[in-house]
């Protein structure tokens, strides 16, 4: 009770706004809003984590004792929903707040961690961890690390090493596991020791067709192209059709569609026989450049 009274009666002041401005994390949060369309639940969750870490930083300045906040994370969602981009921003936030020393992001998959024969996995995993120290290790499609149907698989060895480092060197490294939500849930069920070390779970929703159209416009502007009004409508229809097809990968699929539209635009211009071109000719994507996709020849179920 005495200790609590001392804390409550202590009139030491800390300036939250000053600390917030000093870390410049608002700059990263602004980038997140500008660079990623939609994803409101994700952005909200990242702001919540940033707020927790900022307050924890202030508490430590006043020597208020509390356990270190759990920083390891799980990003779940379909491909192309911005998981890697958000991981990069999270690494930047953690660095600015002083929770990691370097702030870099190292992205790996099973192949980078797991060997093909006895004695090969440990050196591979340890080398990756060495490279990731002081930053964030992003393990994409993490569920491939564990193969329950194969007792001789070496993935479990990599997981054991990860567990040790996540616990013993949590002040030097943050690990983010990523993948499809349903598979990640099974992965954690099979590895309870891993699940207990992951404090922050962030679910990435699929984009709507309207959001994907906004993303397409952002991508096309970055490459100094533009859509005609009719091309806008055609791309929206393309997106709605593509979302119903197998292997749809959100923004990644839209980027591929734009690349193909650019190729068709180039071929259209080349085939026209025009020898003198205007700037408008070179930057404009027409509806026909999208309509020639084989997707429009398929039944729209």
UniProtKB/Swiss-Prot annotation:
GO cellular component term, pick one: chloroplast
Any one GO molecular function term: ATP hydrolysis activity
SMART domains according to UniProt: AAA
Keyword DNA-binding: no
Gene3D superfamilies in UniProt: 1.10.8.60, P-loop containing nucleotide triphosphate hydrolases (3.40.50.300)
Keywords assigned: ATP-binding, Chloroplast, Nucleotide-binding, Plastid
Binding site for ATP: 77-84
Function: Necessary for the expression of RuBisCO.
Organism of this sequence: Porphyra purpurea (Red seaweed)
Subcellular location: Plastid, Chloroplast
Family of the protein in this entry: Belongs to the CbxX/CfxQ family.
Protein name: Protein CfxQ homolog
